[in-house]
């Protein structure tokens, strides 16, 4: 039997073509999308500024080789670094994701679409500084917002129906694909060059979820998105040189992504690319917690207040029952020792125990100093979770996109509180009116972590005036964030 393969170069896979046509041709007309992108930008930058408080993050920042000087390099907010766009994308992306406090998208695949801002902002700033140096017009922040909307859409629409987690792949592969497409367009590549760039992103071997799950949970989950968005910038720059692409990167028999990495299945799509994802993205506003636990933490805070009013403490608790959805059980229902902050912020029992004990949940609560309190593990042992199929159905319903959790607390004296149910977290599109004022407050708090009062005010004066922000050159806006 012949094993010869027919060596006829195919057309580009339809999935790749659709991404490229969208990023090149789609005109964003949604006011809601731009409104949301504005707040998303501020929130994402603020998350990065907070991460600078943590040495484990800061040690990864800066140039690859100390002392490297890049003329007209991209700024890294909250630092003095000015780097090549690839390394700047890694720096910004790692900062953004470090504390698990930036936005979230929940579907068949999970992810954090604002991770793409690493590549988008680094490239836009680098292009702007070089344009100004050459006497040309820089990019504006409106172009950054447009790029964010499109990157959100690419990552989120693919995620709606396609569970990369089911085959052990990490969602940052979608950051790489989305960032590659948007950055390539921003760089001014031709259609053929962008097709090549996106195909290169799919051909890459993709990150495994190993570092997100027991027994190997670790800090790579905090820099994996920075790695992906920086790789995207590199691939786009390679394509700009004329580097070839691989038309059937997805569909090639035996050697394509589908056969190698997706068990021979092909992607399914719920809707065409538009602006749906940015309009419906979830913000983490109140708690730096894995998003499937956000409503559980909110419920636990309510229960803490009820215990205070009743004169009870966590020491009086006999049992805690969490009624939840399937994705929560699969990702963050965790028993046994928790070895590091990355372990703890992906354990629903930990994230519920802390507010029941202390009436709070902050990024510092995942650190060893707090985690060594033996009362936390003792309370974790009393917390049990089970799936409510109705919560799971509402989680997958595109018209609801609920992330429901309900908690019941029983006490050693035989009494119990009524179940506290929270279906939509405060960062959900259905609670924007509640959430946006708190999001702005979160941004102000994060600015205050790094900048003196007058500099904070200069940043706020521009950032909270969207019309002024949109017209501002990218390089001038990022100059506001230099320490």
Curated annotation (Swiss-Prot):
Its EC number is 4.2.1.79, 4.2.1.3. It is an enzyme of class 4 (lyase). It comes from the Bacteria. Keywords: Lyase, Tricarboxylic acid cycle. Gene3D superfamilies: 2-methylcitrate dehydratase PrpD. It comes from Salmonella typhimurium (strain LT2 / SGSC1412 / ATCC 700720). Transmembrane segments: none annotated. GO terms for molecular function: 2 iron, 2 sulfur cluster binding; 2-methylcitrate dehydratase activity; aconitate hydratase activity. InterPro entries: 2Me_IsoCit_deHydtase_PrpD, MmgE/PrpD_sf, MmgE/PrpD_sf_1, MmgE/PrpD_sf_2, MmgE_PrpD, MmgE_PrpD_C, MmgE_PrpD_N. It catalyses: (2S,3S)-2-methylcitrate = 2-methyl-cis-aconitate + H2O; citrate = D-threo-isocitrate. Disruption phenotype: Cells lacking this gene accumulate 2-methylcitrate during growth on propionate. This is 2-methylcitrate dehydratase. Pfam families: MmgE_PrpD_C (PF19305), MmgE_PrpD_N (PF03972). Belongs to the PrpD family. Pathway: Organic acid metabolism; propanoate degradation; Carbohydrate metabolism; tricarboxylic acid cycle; isocitrate from oxaloacetate: step 2/2. GO terms for biological process: propionate catabolic process, 2-methylcitrate cycle; propionate metabolic process, methylcitrate cycle; tricarboxylic acid cycle. Involved in the catabolism of short chain fatty acids (SCFA) via the 2-methylcitrate cycle I (propionate degradation route). Catalyzes the dehydration of 2-methylcitrate (2-MC) to yield the cis isomer of 2-methyl-aconitate. It is also able to catalyze the dehydration of citrate at a lower rate, and the hydration of cis-aconitate. It has no aconitase-like activity and is unable to catalyze the hydration of 2-methyl-cis-aconitate. Monomer. The keyword Protease does not apply. Coiled coil: none annotated.
């Amino acid at each position: 039997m012949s094993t010869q393969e027919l060596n006829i170069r195919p057309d580009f896979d339809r999935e790749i073509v659709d991404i490229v046509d969208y990023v090149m041709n789609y005109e964003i007309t949604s006011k809601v999308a731009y409104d949301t992108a504005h707040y998303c930008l501020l929130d994402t930058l603020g998350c990065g500024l907070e991460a600078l408080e943590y040495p484990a993050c800061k040690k990864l920042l800066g140039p690859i080789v100390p002392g490297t000087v890049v003329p007209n390099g991209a700024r890294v907010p909250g630092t003095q670094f000015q780097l090549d766009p690839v390394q700047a994308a890694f720096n910004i992306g790692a900062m953004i994701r470090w504390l698990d406090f930036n936005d979230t998208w929940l579907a068949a695949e999970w992810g954090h679409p604002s991770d793409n801002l690493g590549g988008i902002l680094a490239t836009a700033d680098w292009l702007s500084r070089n344009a100004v140096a050459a006497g040309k017009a820089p990019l504006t922040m409106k172009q950054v917002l447009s790029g964010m909307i499109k990157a959100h859409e690419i990552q989120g629409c693919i995620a709606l129906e396609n569970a990369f987690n089911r085959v052990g792949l990490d969602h940052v592969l979608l950051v790489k694909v989305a960032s590659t497409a948007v950055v390539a367009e921003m760089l001014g590549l031709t259609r053929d060059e962008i097709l090549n760039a996106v195909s290169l992103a799919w051909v890459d071997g993709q990150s495994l979820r190993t570092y997100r799950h027991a027994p190997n949970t670790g800090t790579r989950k905090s820099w994996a998105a920075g790695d992906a968005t920086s790789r995207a910038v590199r691939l786009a720059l390679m394509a700009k040189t004329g580097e070839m692409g691989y038309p059937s990167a997805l569909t090639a028999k035996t050697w394509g992504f589908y056969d190698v990495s997706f068990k021979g299945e092909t992607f399914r799509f719920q809707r065409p690319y538009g602006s749906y994802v940015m309009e419906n993205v979830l913000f983490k506003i109140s708690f730096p917690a894995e998003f499937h636990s956000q409503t559980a933490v909110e419920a636990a805070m309510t229960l803490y207040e009820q215990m205070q009013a009743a004169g009870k403490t966590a020491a009086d608790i006999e049992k805690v029952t969490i009624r939840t959805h399937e994705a929560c059980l699969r990702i963050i229902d965790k028993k046994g020792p928790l070895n590091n902050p990355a372990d703890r912020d992906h354990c629903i029992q930990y994230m519920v125990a802390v507010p029941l004990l202390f009436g709070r949940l902050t990024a510092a609560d995942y650190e060893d100093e707090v985690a060594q309190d033996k009362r936390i593990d003792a309370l974790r042992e009393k917390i049990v979770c089970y799936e409510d199929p109705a919560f799971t159905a509402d989680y997958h319903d595109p018209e609801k996109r609920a992330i429901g959790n309900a908690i019941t607390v029983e006490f050693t004296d035989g009494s119990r509180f009524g179940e506290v149910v929270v279906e939509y977290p405060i960062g959900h599109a259905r609670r924007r009116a509640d959430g946006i004022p708190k999001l702005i407050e979160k941004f102000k708090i994060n600015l205050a972590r790094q900048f003196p009062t007058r500099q904070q005010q200069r940043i706020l004066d521009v950032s909270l005036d969207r019309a002024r922000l949109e017209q501002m050159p990218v390089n001038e806006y990022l100059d506001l964030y230099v320490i």
